[in-house]
Amino acid sequence: MAYIEFRGICKSYDGVNQVLKNINLDVEKGELVTLLGPSGCGKSTLLRSLAGLEDISSGQIILDGEDITNTPVQKRGIGMVFQQYSLFQNMNVEDNIAFGLKIAKMDKNEIDKKVKAAIEMVDLTGKEKSYPSQLSGGQQQRVAIARAIVMEPKVLLLDEPLSAIDAKLRRELQEKIKRVQKELKITTIFVTHDQDEAMIMSDKIHLMNQGIIEQSGKPVQLYTHPVSKFAAEFIGHYNILTPVELTAFFPEKRYPGNYYVIRPETFMLSKEPIEDPAYLTFDAKVVDFISRGNVLRYTLQCKDVVFTSEVLFRSFALFEPGATVHVGIEEHNLLRLND
């Protein structure tokens, strides 16, 4: 039995348009699971339904073997961190973190011990007496996380907590959250629209689209084997091609179905003809390229088909716009979608 079970979850605000459409998913104890998807797909609504902040129209939510569908928010044992830090501006770091423990009338010595441990865990030692206005956005979010984990919740819910933080700090906080989650072995559900963030953070990803679960699996599974055009477009920079477009590469072959995807990094580019029989080969013209640090992304054209390829930077293997290159791909990297 899973630690968290969503069973047939439906949600409609007007009785007609469903925000959640018969959601069924499991979360194992100790996992960090991400609900990933574009704005309006239902991911935050599903998260809030687990917290008790949203009523569901039908279905059942089970936590640790107990049906909590109608359990009041305060009795669910769930901690939640939002995009907005929601800190008490008139309280310092220590008091913000201790607030819930004081409400629970915990012994002062125990409160001090737990708050100290939480501060150390989120690397805020030395900031105990600082007020929110004296902290950076990243530090304020760490206070919010510490305030949630100090209560030792059964589940930690994170609703796009890093979206308002700049890229460098976001990466640091991603690493901190993942470290804290693993140390505490706390079951965590993370909501984001950022596929890179989901790939970095997650043990498992549930990709949502218009109120349904489009695809579930480990990050590498979603990246290497998207099941639909939506999944391929949302998860990675795939080349999405029709069977007709594929025949521009390989005129002698015929491909059934509607769509195929090719990951940019699976193409081999060469100045010399590719003799390896494991590769299907064709020629293409370089349209343009951009540098992304140690990765070069080439825009290439074969007949009327434009596609992209990514290769590690090597100064001796640069291809200038206008050049003709030999392209190879192993056939198992042509992935047929279910669409």
Short names for language-model regions:
Residues L32, V73-V227:
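ABC ATPase nucleotide-binding domains
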Residues A51:
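Helix-to-loop junction immediately C-terminal to a conserved catalytic motif
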Residues V16-Q18:
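Short coil-to-beta microelement around the adenine-binding A-loop and adjacent beta1/P-loop entry
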Residues A248-D339:
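Non-catalytic connector elements of ABC transporters
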Residues L36-P38:
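The feature captures the beta-strand-to-loop junction immediately N-terminal to the Walker
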Residues G59-D67:
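Conserved ABC transporter NBD signature motif
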Residues E5, D26, I62, H326-G328:
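ABC ATPase nucleotide-binding domain
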